[in-house]
Amino acid sequence: MPSTIISCAVTGSAPTPDKNPAVPVTPLEIANSAIDAARAGAAIVHCHVRSLETKKPSMELELYREVANLIRDADVDVILNLTTGPGARFSPSSADPGKASANSQMCSPEKRVEHILELKPDICSLDVATMNRKSHVFLNSPEHLNVMADYIRKANVKPEIEVFDTGHILNAKKMIDDGLIAEPPFFLFCLGVDYGAPATLETMLLMRSMFPKG
């Protein structure tokens, strides 16, 4: 029987303690959740960090550093996966659609991979996706993705290529062909997310058929 890889996202990008009080917030809580997951059998722990004031997703380097150090210092054999997703939330201003509203969180591609270059996790997420969400656009332009992928490759960190729909696989294949993502690629299907591909067997078979050969 083939081995099964269990990956545990201990917070995700959206849930907050308002929705579920069990969602970890502090670096110690996040690290302890990751360590518990590893001891329960997870091979990969996927980590976001949270602002200690707002409890919402944060990009603060020192929060990532504390989480990474706590996990690395623990007696667990687990692959550390840090997100690069934050910094791509765009919602147009109602007064001027060409500008971002207060609900947006946009930043440079360099900022989005700052913690990856500094901390060098085993792997990191790379969302090759632009798509509508409930209240905003998840905006990852080809230019920004190329810059991020190049930094990640030069840091010798393996990107976990997150695809939410079929076209995202084509985008990733172009980046592989251009030498921005090293082979063999590591893909992750993100299915059932508003408004991406549905979580069905048919979807998985179609997306699997589109993978690069080998």
Task: Please report, for each region that a protein language model flagged, where it lies by residue.
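Active-site beta-loop-alpha junctions enriched in small/polar residues
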Residues: 9-13, 50-52, 83-89, 129-131, ...
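Active-site beta->alpha loop and helix N-cap motifs at the rims of alpha/beta catalytic domains
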Residues: 61-139
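Alpha-helix-loop-beta-strand connector modules within alpha/beta enzyme cores
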Residues: 8, 55-84, 147-154, 206-214
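N-terminal small/glycine-rich loop or linker at the start of catalytic domains
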Residues: 1-22, 86-94, 125-132
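Conserved, mostly hydrophobic/aromatic
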Residues: 30, 37, 48, 124, ...
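Catalytic alpha/beta core domains of metabolic enzymes, predominantly
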Residues: 123-214
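Glycine-rich, proline-tolerant flexible connector loops at the mouths of alpha/beta enzymes
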Residues: 18, 43-67, 133, 190-191
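Hydrophobic faces of well-ordered beta-strands that scaffold small-molecule active sites
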Residues: 6-10, 45-47, 78-84, 122-126, ...
